[in-house]
Amino acid sequence: MRVLFAGTPAVAVPSLDALVKAGFDVVAVLTRPDAPVGRKRVLTPSPVAARAMELGIDVIRAARVDADTTAGIAKYAPDVAAIVAYGGIVPKAALGVPTHGWVNLHFSLLPAWRGAAPVQRSIIAGDDVTGAATFQLEEGLDTGPVFGTLTETVRPEDTAGDLLERLSISGAVLLSQTLSAIDAGQAAPQPQIGEVSHAPKLTLDDGRLDWQQPALALNRRARGVTPEPGAWTTLDGQRVKLEPVALRPEVKDLPPGSIRVDGKSVLVGTGSHAVELGRVQPAGKKMMPPADWARGLATPERVVFE
């Protein structure tokens, strides 16, 4: 079966590898254009483009699936298109190009968390279980009938990066199985059933920690926005980046935002009980252990995060 693969970030690479390993004829890859990376802003291929070039697969670079891109896809006469985090909308004109349409691997148990940031929103919401689904792409946002699903436990220490990494590997197997079923004429997609929730793309402001909130909510938020866009707070009007924070339920006497140095640990008060800081990155500096950061403060006991 001739497959067009559409994807851009590193989490899509395991799916591309799985399809190649399973023996599918991946005729081309659709990915976002090369983007500037690092301080020197060097134009760099997407992780999917880089892997496709290693595998000798043709690469179509497009910021959007317009008429020209659709025509380029049609030249490859794909039987099916598999899409994993491509980063753009597939319009109606392109949906009908592959014989069997487009199959999307989405990192949630649809219809939960439709949208661009399902894993991040799931962690922030405090879900105990999430998963992945393959579904038939249609004009609505993640609304198409589902081919298959898998479940994944959300561990107490999981960041969005951790959970996405696991789902990218197990999801790759699910995607390969789905395409095999389609190829064998055995696929039977079912309408989505259940409560709908939405997962819009995270903004920088989603990473800001409000110390008036309960500790558990802050722990979940910090994990959900790690590695991107990252958790942060402010001190004297300057942004301070934070790695995920740990719960310290035995410490209940710290006012929200106030800090306390406890040996090598730095505690911060919240709306419920204290949390323990992970690494800290003050403005203009590198990430550092919290105790090192606290040693640079003139009067730590007077510091209050804003």
Swiss-Prot record:
Keyword check for Protein biosynthesis: yes
EC number in record: 2.1.2.9
Keywords: Protein biosynthesis, Transferase
Catalytic reaction equation(s): L-methionyl-tRNA(fMet) + (6R)-10-formyltetrahydrofolate = N-formyl-L-methionyl-tRNA(fMet) + (6S)-5,6,7,8-tetrahydrofolate + H(+)
Molecular function terms, GO-annotated: methionyl-tRNA formyltransferase activity
Highest taxon in the source lineage: Bacteria
One term under GO cellular component: cytosol
Broadest EC class assigned to this enzyme: transferase
Short name of any one Pfam family annotated for the protein: Formyl_trans_C
Positions that bind (6S)-5,6,7,8-tetrahydrofolate: 108-111
InterPro entries the record matches: Fmt, Formyl_trans_C, Formyl_transf_N, Formyl_transf_N_sf, Formyl_transferase-like_C_sf, Met-tRNA-FMT_C, Met-tRNA-FMT_N
Protein biosynthesis recorded as keyword: yes
Function: Attaches a formyl group to the free amino group of methionyl-tRNA(fMet). The formyl group appears to play a dual role in the initiator identity of N-formylmethionyl-tRNA by promoting its recognition by IF2 and preventing the misappropriation of this tRNA by the elongation apparatus.
Similarity comment: family membership: Belongs to the Fmt family.
Descriptive protein name: Methionyl-tRNA formyltransferase
